[in-house]
Amino acid sequence: MSTTTTSSKPEFPADAATKEYAASLDASDPLAGFREKFIIPSKANIASKKLAKPGLSSEPCIYFCGNSLGIQPKATAKYLEAQLDTWSSIGVSGHFTNVEDSPLREWQNLAEQAAESMSRVVGAAPEEVAAMGTLTMNLHLLLASFYRPTATKHKILMDWKAFPSDHYAIESHIAWHDLDPKESMVLIGPDEGTFEIPTEKILSYIDQHADDAALILLPGIQYYTGQLFDIQKITEYAQSRGLVVGWDLAHAYGNVHLKLHDWNVDFAAWCTYKYGNAGPGAMAGLFVHERHGRVDYREGEDSPKFRHRLTGWYGGDKSVRFKMDNNFKPIPGAGGYQISNPSAIDLASLCAALSVFDETSMAELRRKSVLMTAYLEHLLLKDTTDESRLFDIITPSEPAARGAQLSLLLRPGLLHKVAQRLQEAGIICDKREPGVVRVAPVPLYNTFTEVWTFVEQLKAALEE
């Protein structure tokens, strides 16, 4: 069985469908110890409607919903407690006091602590990343800076089934410029009867609209189908045709190996509460390539030249931030896109989640993820035919074209019954109307034995 690369598809032996084989994969998993760094919800707690403390039941659920919300790292409580203790003990001095026994920097530099760790997750220089805001808010800020339509180049290319918030954001920016979204939004979809959008089709749309498109914004991973787009190839080609290129990495952050700097991406934004495990509604992140974040002082210290953006005091250089002279001098890089003083509590939760990523690498996580999702696919398809299965896997089969998630399109009328049966069995995954179950085994805390158990329970639910 090949497990050395993420481009080749693992192959499995004849006994792969046994629980013993799944256990052998767990026994040889170099990342198995990371599961102990998380609080796994118990079966008893997920069935209860009362607020319960973790650990009341010894039997954990099977949590395959990290593509919607990751589970809580054990470090989160420690980091939040440290932040609350800092606030309660020294008050406003927490902005500038580096508390020696705290895992967190002083509040003034806390966003930089998060950005440094996030930069390693997305393959960027620390100066190219900012920890701030939430995903759609950050997309708005980035579009305000990078979408500069003209009379001839005004269209935005996007995927046909973008997450609604992305659709709303793009639509509103087009309307803000007194343009008609029906004319200026170009949706790229799959061919009739399919779900995957071939890279060649995206490139053909870029060619078709090279003269009238200003920008292309795509998801790194399509939230519904789980398709991973060829970020490097699409970025390079779109830029060669004169388009600005942005990426929504909500489902790619913490999931796949990214190299945003090397791929020359113009801008990107992501949330951190899915595979990033930073908590519901957690502080998000954005990327601005270094070539767009430069600040030019050749015309004098009081006349900095920089890329247009919506500005706020927290994006100002820290050396002059408190001078209050109304002369904005942005932090070079993505930090110059910050608007307001970020929540130290939210940053504590984010830094706690990132502390887990600091102990490994995206290359290692991706290696396990490729094997785990391939094993899931192998078990789902074993001893079935296209005609006999009550579901279709609409996620691409090639590892290079997907992340952790597999999207299962069930036959009409099965979704709610199957979802209920899985929940009763203590399995948490995600459903999307009209008939898709999204299953995402996460390499940080899920096991191969859980994959085996899930498939057994799913098949039992379908047989019922």
UniProtKB/Swiss-Prot annotation:
Lineage start: Eukaryota, Fungi, Dikarya, Ascomycota, Pezizomycotina
Annotated keywords: Cytoplasm, Hydrolase, Pyridine nucleotide biosynthesis, Pyridoxal phosphate
Subunit structure: Homodimer.
Gene3D superfamilies associated with the record: Aspartate Aminotransferase, domain 1 (3.90.1150.10), Type I PLP-dependent aspartate aminotransferase-like (Major domain) (3.40.640.10)
Modified sites of kind N6-(pyridoxal phosphate)lysine: 274
Annotated GO MF terms: kynureninase activity; pyridoxal phosphate binding
Catalytic activity: L-kynurenine + H2O = anthranilate + L-alanine + H(+); 3-hydroxy-L-kynurenine + H2O = 3-hydroxyanthranilate + L-alanine + H(+)
SUPFAM superfamilies: PLP-dependent transferases
Keyword Cytoplasm: yes
Pfam families with a match to the protein in the record: Aminotran_5 (PF00266), KYNU_C (PF22580)
EC numbers: 3.7.1.3
Gene: bna5-2
Record's GO cellular component terms: cytoplasm
Disulphide bridges, residue numbers: none
Cofactor(s) demanded: pyridoxal 5'-phosphate
Name by which UniProt lists this protein: Kynureninase 2
Purpose: Catalyzes the cleavage of L-kynurenine (L-Kyn) and L-3-hydroxykynurenine (L-3OHKyn) into anthranilic acid (AA) and 3-hydroxyanthranilic acid (3-OHAA), respectively.
Species annotation: Aspergillus clavatus (strain ATCC 1007 / CBS 513.65 / DSM 816 / NCTC 3887 / NRRL 1 / QM 1276 / 107)
